[in-house]
Amino acid sequence: MGHFYFVRHGQTVWNAENKICGATDSPLTEYGRAQAAETGKNILESGMKADEILYSPLSRAADTAKIISSMTGIPCRAEARLTEQNFGKWESTPRDGKDFKKAKESFACRYEGGESMLQLAQRIYNLLDEIKVESDRKTYILVAHNGIARMVQSYFQDMTNEEFASFGVKNCQVVRYDF
């Protein structure tokens, strides 16, 4: 079996303000763009090989992927299933709010107009199942979001609710996953 890489997008305006982005588009900061360029440079210099970059269509991930692609020459395309979870009424609220933290414990809750953890898991697990089938002949870099990173990690590792909630990937961190 093969492998793939996961990269979280660069820093956004709302990351800097400690707000929940979710499915709301929050643009990269200048620092976030610099992080993406540094990641592209590191991928190139490390000799990491990939056939294609798949990215969330939200601008923070799309811009990160396109910067990495321009530096590495790896082609890229949008993959809608990598869109961050829609946190409904919690979008743009403080990330460390205790009400939001409590709401996240309800995996089947849609956050009043959003998407449940179970719905998110279905689309991410289905995508990873497809990538696994192709992994012997094709290596991907997925550029997405921290909520997606949690789901990817849970695909490979059993996690308690607390471990799941606390798991995170830093902006522009590269993580390798082996099937």
Please give the residue ranges for each predicted region.
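Active-site-proximal alpha-helix that buttresses catalytic centers in soluble enzyme cores
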Residues: 2, 7, 11-74, 115
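A secondary-structure boundary/capping signal
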Residues: 8, 78, 144-145
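Catalytic metal-binding/acid-base residues of hydrolase active sites
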Residues: 11, 59, 82-83, 147
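Short aromatic-enriched loop/helix-cap "lid" or pocket-rim segments at secondary-structure transitions
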Residues: 16-19, 65, 88-92, 155
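Alpha-helical elements of Rossmann-like donor-binding domains used by nucleotide-donor carbohydrate transfer enzymes
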Residues: 38, 42, 63, 67, ...
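Short beta-strand scaffold positions
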Residues: 55-56, 122, 143-144
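Active-site-adjacent alpha-helix immediately C-terminal to a catalytic or transition-state-stabilizing loop
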Residues: 62, 125-179
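Phosphate-handling substructures
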Residues: 70-125
